[in-house]
Amino acid sequence: MCDEEVAALVVDNGSGMCKAGFAGDDAPRAVFPSIVGRPRHQGVMVGMGQKDSYVGDEAQSKRGILTLKYPIEHGIVTNWDDMEKIWHHTFYNELRVAPEEHPVLLTEAPLNPKANREKMTQIMFETFNTPAMYVAIQAVLSLYASGRTTGIVLDSGDGVSHTVPIYEGYALPHAILRLDLAGRDLTDYLMKILTERGYSFTTTAEREIVRDIKEKLCYVALDFEQEMATAASSSSLEKSYELPDGQVITIGNERFRCPEALFQPSFLGMEANGIHETTYNSIMKCDVDIRKDLYANTVLSGGTTMYPGIADRMQKEITALAPSTMKIKIIAPPERKYSVWIGGSILASLSTFQQMWISKQEYDESGPSIVHRKCF
């Protein structure tokens, strides 16, 4: 089998979900929760073949008897043993491939510590024996997926949000800003404000229900105060949702109060700037000559940018902050939930990229630090 036929594997490890598949595909084959669960109790049934750990959907469905851990916190891997289990599950159970036969493209959070990139590299070559690998910054891949090489990406997932200015394909590290406010915080906030309505959601299982309510019914208001007034005076904004047990709940202003926290983190008791100010501050940290290009190419990426109305609201807020003559364009691709993965799929299948891979041979000669020389 010649090299041309071996598809590279693309794995985008997010705080909440892991997206994996083959380079050249237009969507990931496998999308599963980034969780590892271990049994809380000793098994009583003899011969049940109890596993000592469960990953992804299986961990999710057995969560009643497991202790769940997320090895990726705020976009950064903090537990390598569990991370290894997630990668093992990705290759062998989800994609059903032998990692020693495929180059692997991994993604990393912006500002990922150097030691972390080295550790990822080491695990790929030493544990999984991959023939070649590469580590790419998530936001840069999202920008590629939108067909650009210059722009600013607001990437907001489950565990962390970043604003990443990119010029001619290179992220500008001095201007990257991180906001520890993302999907998980919004789910928690929605649990809290639904409790105020008299619906009690407390367990991890119930949190998943609230996440579903959030994904199906929430939206961003163009004018928050005006929307609050509308919600107070009529029931036109109310929607109902059927819980798994058949009970139907009604939600009104919670629909837009929940994602409003992205623009007003004070709702969550956080002293931080909203995503619009963070984006603006990120642009202002860049060279004055490239700001025009960033304002005109502001790309939204990640699951937490999927709320209806978010692009219009960003346009309005950034227009208010920017110089009055500035052309501002917010790009919100419909597939932005997976745009990091899609960008990776595009990158790994480019003919010009093939000399960029770190080969097993190069790794054996230089060790894990090779990653800083070849992936930047």
UniProtKB/Swiss-Prot annotation:
Coiled coil ranges = none
Q: Which UniProt keywords apply?
A: Acetylation, ATP-binding, Cytoplasm, Cytoskeleton, Hydrolase, Nucleotide-binding, Oxidation
Where is this gene product found?
Cytoplasm, Cytoskeleton
Tissue specificity of this protein = Brain of newly enclosed adults.
Q: State whether keyword Nucleotide-binding applies.
A: yes
Q: Which Gene3D superfamilies match?
A: 3.30.420.40, Actin, Chain A, domain 4
Keyword RNA-binding assigned to the entry: answer is no
SMART domains in alphabetical order: ACTIN
The record's GO molecular-function terms, alphabetically, read: ATP binding; hydrolase activity
Membership in a protein family = Belongs to the actin family.
**Free-text function comment from the UniProt entry:** Actins are highly conserved proteins that are involved in various types of cell motility and are ubiquitously expressed in all eukaryotic cells. Multiple isoforms are involved in various cellular functions such as cytoskeleton structure, cell mobility, chromosome movement and muscle contraction.
Alphabetized PANTHER family for the sequence: ACTIN
- Name of the protein this chain belongs to: Actin, cytoplasmic A3a
